[in-house]
């Protein structure tokens, strides 16, 4: 069942990515992932797909599963807080759902440093959700440090995509 859910999420992400137009952004800017966060805010499932309410696909497509961080920081930006507020509302709607928040970093820094930073990032997101009324028993955290990048480049535009927190169901 989990494999099927994962396959549906991956298929949906490919469809969404295939529909996106090419960007002319230079990759320069604040470097906190705000541009990437805005790109991921598409509403509703792709045509021909139905989303099970309360599922991981529902979270990804209708709420957003990622928040982004500035270099060497674990504090939440206003965009990150906005996404987490939506996640909290979604979690209140689906009271039996448990989540894991993954903390990720870019490739710079040692493995140990990035694991600790990823943990701080995941805990920052968890603490915010708990402050909004979500039971801490429903929220697990894990740090992957720099071990699971989503962008493989060696420049700021890639690094800003990798400095993230990802909420999984």
Residue spans of the language-model regions?
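Extracytoplasmic/secreted proteins, especially bacterial periplasmic and envelope-associated proteins
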Residues: 79-86, 112, 116, 120, ...
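A non-catalytic structural micro-motif
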Residues: 95-104, 119-150, 163-169
């Amino acid at each position: 069942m989990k494999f099927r859910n994962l396959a549906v999420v991956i298929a949906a992400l490919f469809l969404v990515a295939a529909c996106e137009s090419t960007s002319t952004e230079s990759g320069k800017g604040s470097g906190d992932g705000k541009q990437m966060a805005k790109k991921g805010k598409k509403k509703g499932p792709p045509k021909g797909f139905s989303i099970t309410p309360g599922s991981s696909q529902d979270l990804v497509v209708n709420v957003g599963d990622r928040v982004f961080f500035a270099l060497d920081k674990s504090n939440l930006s206003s965009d990150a807080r906005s996404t987490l507020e939506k996640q909290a509302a979604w979690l209140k709607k689906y009271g039996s759902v448990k989540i894991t928040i993954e903390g990720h970093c870019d490739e710079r820094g040692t493995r140990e440093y990035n694991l600790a930073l990823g943990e701080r990032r995941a805990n920052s997101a968890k603490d915010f959700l708990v402050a909004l009324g979500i039971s801490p028993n429903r929220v697990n955290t894990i740090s992957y440090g720099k071990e699971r990048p989503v962008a493989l480049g060696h420049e700021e535009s890639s690094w800003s995509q990798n400095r993230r927190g990802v909420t999984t169901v």
